[in-house]
């Protein structure tokens, strides 16, 4: 099955109350929205939670395209994570990788699927990016 997922995270204050959201589209026909919040968090943690929680909803191995407006998430999962693992979860400045717990969860969540990551410009008129932005922001209230 081919699935598209749009994700976003938001934070009121950084750190502060955060929200995440994802829209899951299977074969462009069925849409399901997932979203949630955390009390004391950061925008980057919320950006990571959105794809983690969306991937949890997909039970069978699938071909998935995940759209995010976060270069942090896209670059982290497609490029940086390989080096982090080789360097015992240390960043290029030899410090522990921030949000390692969520990077590990996201990496593990991707393993049972064929996942393609795409960056989408925020607030650029994309219907589903706008929707996940609104849902994520609503969770920060």
Segments predicted by a language model, with ranges:
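RNase H catalytic domain
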Residues: 10-17, 53-131, 135, 140
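RNase H-like nuclease fold core
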Residues: 1-45, 53-58, 133-134, 138-141
């Amino acid at each position: 099955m081919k699935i598209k997922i749009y994700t976003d995270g938001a934070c009121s204050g950084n750190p502060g109350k955060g929200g995440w959201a994802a829209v899951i589209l299977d074969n462009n026909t069925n849409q399901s929205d997932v979203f949630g919040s955390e009390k004391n968090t950061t925008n980057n943690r919320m950006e990571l939670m959105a794809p983690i929680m969306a991937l949890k909803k997909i039970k069978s191995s699938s071909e998935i395209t995940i759209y995010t407006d976060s270069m942090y998430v896209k670059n982290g999962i497609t490029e940086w994570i390989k080096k982090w693992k080789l360097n015992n979860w240390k960043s290029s400045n030899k410090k522990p990788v921030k949000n390692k717990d969520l990077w590990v969860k996201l990496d593990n969540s991707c393993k049972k699927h064929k996942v393609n990551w795409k960056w989408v410009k925020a607030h650029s008129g994309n219907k589903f990016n706008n929707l996940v932005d609104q849902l994520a922001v609503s969770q920060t209230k």
